[in-house]
Amino acid sequence: MDFLVAVKKTVELRLSTEPSPPQRTAPLVDFTKAVGDFGIIAEYKRASPRGVVRLDLPPWAYFAELHSYASAFSVLTEPFWFLGDYRFIPIAKAFKPVLMKDFVIDRRQIEAAYGYGADAVLIIYRLVEREKAMELAEYAQRLGLTPLVEVDNAQDAREVATWGGRVVIGINARDLRTLETNLTRAFDIAKSLRGDVDYIIESGISRPEEVEKACLLYARGVLVGTSLMKNPALAKELKAAAERCLARR
């Protein structure tokens, strides 16, 4: 059983037991505008399918330390594989706009993202059928959320690029079926999209030169999780790299 099949089963279990989300009280922010021409999206991720990332860094401390360097935050809410929690969203939202990152297969999860205060929601193209992914993205837009549609190959990226609207493509350097990471492949996909659609690059970013390369490919930003969880001080270097690139772009 590959990872996506396994995780889909856990999501179905969660949906049968989770309570209704709260009424939204946080202001809704245009996530793409918040990221700007090129921004760092810092992700709070306590664990991954490969194991624990870091448990001794509470969310409020992480967000407080990084908010000066990040344009937005990404919050993992999946509890079994990533030790995430919806309640991390309002903590992040106190500092910056928020992307809710989960394995979304149902409208109820988008409603939870909205209710807890997120401004954008991740939709993994390979997790659901094409029509379902489009339906979820459209529903997110109706609620005022920005859908970040994640792909890991050029064919899917070109397909999503035809959708229009406020959809942002997330190019994942990690293949979610094998969990292998290939940043070069992600950059190659980005080259095929340049100028056609807004996109960010996810996974595998850990060095300033990788941030600069993504920026020079006209990505709207990079999403960085594990590297910043292990070393939050890296955020200052990554932001400086982004600023250097924007000055040349």
Swiss-Prot record:
GO terms for molecular function: indole-3-glycerol-phosphate synthase activity; phosphoribosylanthranilate isomerase activity. It catalyses: 1-(2-carboxyphenylamino)-1-deoxy-D-ribulose 5-phosphate + H(+) = (1S,2R)-1-C-(indol-3-yl)glycerol 3-phosphate + CO2 + H2O. The keyword Lyase applies. Keywords: Amino-acid biosynthesis, Aromatic amino acid biosynthesis, Decarboxylase, Lyase, Tryptophan biosynthesis. CDD domains: IGPS. Gene3D superfamilies: Aldolase class I. Signal peptide: none annotated. Pfam families: IGPS. This is Indole-3-glycerol phosphate synthase. It comes from Pyrobaculum neutrophilum (strain DSM 2338 / JCM 9278 / NBRC 100436 / V24Sta).
